[in-house]
Amino acid sequence: FLPAEGGHLDRASGRWALAESHDTIPGSLWFPETGRGVVDPLLWSTLTARVDAVRRDHPDWPIVVFCRADCWMSWNASRRLARAGVANVFWFAEGIDGWHDAGRALMQVVPETVPLARVRNAS
């Protein structure tokens, strides 16, 4: 839910062009910019489609939303998911910083690609 600092979504490919690499909690997915006060519907639909897909296969899995320590973008996104009826959503306030400070490993990640069909329909 971090911003794609210095980066942008290439709407021709659905991929993000980043200015710097990003580390996160192993096994996590990155959906940049989905916690903004006003979120791009294209980005939000990419996130919710992925949540729906995970829930079809694993209906009891929690959805844990995080960013950096005390990042309000992740709080916004977790609240939006819960208000949209997604159950078992949690905000991990300590985020990547807290995970790393606890001595846990991080891994490099790239943002989730926006499906081209959605990009073309949003143009």
Residue ranges of model-derived segments:
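Conserved Rossmann-like nucleotide-cofactor binding loop
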Residues: 97
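Cytosolic catalytic domains that perform sulfur/thiol-centered chemistry
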Residues: 1-93, 101-123
